[in-house]
Amino acid sequence: MNPDEYDLTDSDHQKAIWDLMMQPITVMDVGQTEHVYPTFTPGADKKPYEQNCAGELHGQSQGVHVLEEDTDGDGYVLIEAYANDGTKTDNEYMESRNAKKVQGYVKKSILFEVKPSDKYALLVDKLRQKLYIFEAGAIIGELDVSTGLNNAKQPYNESPAGEYITVSKVGDFNAGSGTIGRFAIRINGGTLLHEVLHDTAKDGTRIYTQYEAQLGMKASHGCIRIQRRANAQGQNMQWLWNNLENKTKVLIWDDQGRQMYEPELPDGGLQLYRNPKGGSNYHVDANCPGVKEKYLPLTGDFTYGDLEKDEFKKLTPCSACGAPVRPETLYERYVFEANQIGAEVTDEVKAKFGIE
């Protein structure tokens, strides 16, 4: 499917996406974290990787599409899917195939079909860095996410697109050095849906500041980080943990080859609040739960459109009450995503952000 052909605000388009997500998914009957290496020719050994191996796929949860059936009786079928991050040569990762659509042959005997849960379904849009929750043919909520971001040391962190099903609840995911992602749910080998990461203070306090600032842009090592702050419908990662059934379909839209979306800015008249006695944040709630009670209620003497004034230039958004990020941050994220997919930032978009 071409994501650019769908308008997520259109109820008919939502129903069409839901119908697609309710279709059975073909997966491979190996362990949830085991690898399958489709080869360019039927029955070939996967080594040497560069010559024989099309990529690395995962069992139980990752959907594959059968392109050619076993017509000659050799027991192999040609499949297509998005390669994962771990495909390794004898010496180095095959980063050129990370998150790329690949084709190769696998044994027909390992393929089986799964009917997804019809309670909910999830759509992750890598271009917009949003997760959309579907129920009964309609979107019932959306959440901010961070998908995988390649870097110089790890040029294989991109979150593969494609279709998946949830297969197990992992719980707390330890990213190392006391950094935790709660409520982790496995959807593709080592790729998890989990709450936005937090560091842990000596007294056990969870510190989300660094990672919540990255929501809405690529930042992870491949997992899908999801907001912890509940949206207007009361949904967040914990809600997903509590409500998703096993075998929930997860559709991930790629960003490559897409048209850039029209960026949205918060209303300039949005009322904001602050602590004029030294607070460093701006807030959307006069009684923000992240502020000590002795400073409440906060002072509401400016709006989102006033953030460029000298008096408010140094204020940063409060993650506890979900204050929107500054316009310059939104623009930086937009430019970053445009560069990721080779798209041009138009003069109209620049004008919208006041960029000359």
Locate predicted features.
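SH3/SH3-like beta-barrel superfamily modules
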Residues: 1-6, 56-107, 307-318
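SH3-family beta-barrel domains
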Residues: 1-45, 57, 263-279, 344-346
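Exported/periplasmic cell-wall-interacting domains
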Residues: 8, 86, 157, 161, ...
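Intrinsically disordered, low-complexity Ser/Thr-rich linker and spacer segments
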Residues: 90-95, 109-119, 264, 328-334, ...
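Gly/Pro-biased beta-strand-loop elements
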Residues: 92, 99-206
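SH3/SH3-like (including bacterial SH3b) beta-barrel domains
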Residues: 45-59, 288-297
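Acidic Ser/Thr/Pro-rich low-complexity disordered segments
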Residues: 25-28, 84-100, 201-204, 288, ...
